[in-house]
Amino acid sequence: MSEFQLVSPYQPTGDQPKAIAGLVKSISEGHRFQTLLGATGTGKTFTIAHTIQQVGRPTLVMAHNKTLAAQLCNELRELFPHNAVEYFISYYDYYQPEAYVPSTDTYIAKSSSINDEIDMLRHSATRSLFERRDVIVVASVSCIYGLGMPEEYLKASIPFKVGQEINQRDVLRDLASIQYERNDLELVRGRFRLKGDVLEIVPAYEDRVIRIEFFGDEIEAIRLIDPVTGEILNSLSALRVYPARHFVTPEAQLERAILNIEQELEEQLALFRKEGKLLEAQRLEQRTRYDLEMLREVGYCNGIENYSRHLTGRKAGEPPACLVDYFKADDWLLVVDESHVTVPQIRGMYNGDRARKQVLVDHGFRLPSALDNRPLKAEEFWAKVHQCIFVSATPGNWELEQSEAQFETRVEDGKTLKFYVQGSGRVIEQVIRPTGVVDPEVHVRPTAGQVDDLLGEIYLRLERSQLGPAERVIVTTLTKRMAEDLTEYLQERGIRVRYLHSEITSIERIEILQDFREGAFDVLVGVNLLREGLDLPEVSLVAILDADKEGFLRAERSLIQMIGRAARNVRGMVVMYADTMTSSMARAIAETQRRREIQLQYNRQHNITPKPIVKKNSNAILSFLAISRKLNDPDLEKAFQAAQEIPLSEIPELIGQLELKMKEAAKNLEFEEAAQLRDRIKKLRQRLLGHPQGI
């Protein structure tokens, strides 16, 4: 029986029961790849949640960016409140990789800032994978980067049990060996302190305190303590403390690694000198000798990850261990969300990393073994995957091929193209929306007078908004300049309009989308920012300017994704402005019409009247400062209430800002406000972890 407990007031409807049954059947039959081809707004996440619940295996859900990963994690935590739904993304707030530009002889040192909260979540994810089966890890593509060997990580963990006899000095030495730091004054994550017979540890994977009480050398009690109030939260009979860092190197392995690094250094120096590269040889020797001295003395050096091949005992070219290796062999499931974007990302990670590091090696900044500190190659990643579900409204041909779909070839515009044959292979379609809302009508109109025609459509929706539910408009252009010019033109005619393009920061982007949903303006103009993951049920019109300009932004998949932005509204409509009908346009329109006819027929058969989507507005402002500015109210309580709904990916940033405010308040002797902020930081950390964890 599955350990996953799905909690929802809703039952699967429309195509969902058929899709769930199809996916579960395909997986239970042992098929490696299957695809959920689900139209926008059909509840693909709900279908995947039911599939996970019925399959009952630990699951990795991959998304193509951290914002989408946070959205998925929030949704899955609501559906699985009693299970471990973890969040695993890159822990860098800022990252400037090491690089060298030969043309200008410019060396750029690595510069980074690690987010402590996200690091805690990463440790929480790996701990859950060791200790339970009912685990869903939602991750970005960065999870294919090296993470340290799971065997060494588990082997280095320290078990504690009530009644166990253990020398206190040995415990302190063991904690130090797995990167915990002793500090008897300030107890924070990754530190421990000993006072008399009481040892207190804050593990790497959460902020609760583990208190171990000794009677002589015998463990008398193990308790979980609230770090703020000191309240006893739980008493345990046993627990295991995992290392403070994922990269764990035993002392014997470190000594072997140092010898291997020295040997590689001598070989590379001989090669450089033979080729007359004396500057490169001098540079490499100086840098590497310093690193070796640091490794001997303190077991660590800056850029230690560049020696990871030696430290983990891998051979040249062997893939590094990553998050996938923390899952148990073949007993797990992979779900790739928005696979048409995520799969190419997996494919491209290795090449970009390799090109940068090769320059460093060629010019004596790094040993050749640094090339093995890398993300997995695509083929290495897929070799580790036992069973997988691709999820997309527009899956790529590669995903469809892996799902054994059939294709037909046609010549269009002088090119031979492959097209998926509907209903073939292990491709499960999900077309019917639970709300009964059908795909929008698509109209093609000439480009002559397109702006005036668009203006008329906008005015029509503004008039309807006065009498009924609010309607919004999305307009997509081909260039940033066009977006800005169109925005200015519409503003001059009294339209409340904003634009989005690549130069707008992620925080500003979410603020603009939030204002759009709340009705602060009615028209949003953008370039390539209005496709996957933009969930706005208020949008009743999507206008696509220059739809006949073939290219990535007007390819079939891009057009279907843009059409999908109007597919959540009962009055959804799409207008493509074009003078010719391109093959991409024709295919996108034909697919939309095919889905629309299926949906209309289903509604007629089941006497369903489409209902507008009522969606909780959860994309709140991303930072405390933005919340305060938006409310125009210094009242901390109101600002914090607004902060309760922020996306999961932004909580670490908010915690950092609240901590700065807390320290500033304490410095100004405003202890009451500092205490309020401390309590709120604690609540946000609890939300970040997502569920009360037993250790």
Swiss-Prot record:
PANTHER family: UVRABC SYSTEM PROTEIN B (PTHR24029:SF0)
Entry binding sites for ATP: G38, A39, T40, G41, T42, G43, K44, T45
Motif (Beta-hairpin): 91-114
Major location category of this protein: cytoplasm
Assembly and interaction partners: Forms a heterotetramer with UvrA during the search for lesions. Interacts with UvrC in an incision complex.
Domain notes: The beta-hairpin motif is involved in DNA binding.
Annotated UVR domain residues: 652-687
Keywords noted in UniProt: ATP-binding, Cytoplasm, DNA damage, DNA excision, DNA repair, Excision nuclease, Helicase, Hydrolase, Nucleotide-binding, SOS response
Domain of life where this protein originates: Bacteria
Name of the featured protein: UvrABC system protein B
Family per record: Belongs to the UvrB family.
Keyword Cytoplasm among record annotations: yes
Described function: The UvrABC repair system catalyzes the recognition and processing of DNA lesions. A damage recognition complex composed of 2 UvrA and 2 UvrB subunits scans DNA for abnormalities. Upon binding of the UvrA(2)B(2) complex to a putative damaged site, the DNA wraps around one UvrB monomer. DNA wrap is dependent on ATP binding by UvrB and probably causes local melting of the DNA helix, facilitating insertion of UvrB beta-hairpin between the DNA strands. Then UvrB probes one DNA strand for the presence of a lesion.
Species of provenance: Synechococcus sp. (strain JA-2-3B'a(2-13))
Sample GO molecular function, one term: helicase activity
Biological process annotations from GO: nucleotide-excision repair; SOS response
Gene3D superfamilies, alphabetized: P-loop containing nucleotide triphosphate hydrolases, UVR domain
One Gene Ontology cellular component annotation held by this UniProt entry: cytoplasm
Signal peptide: none
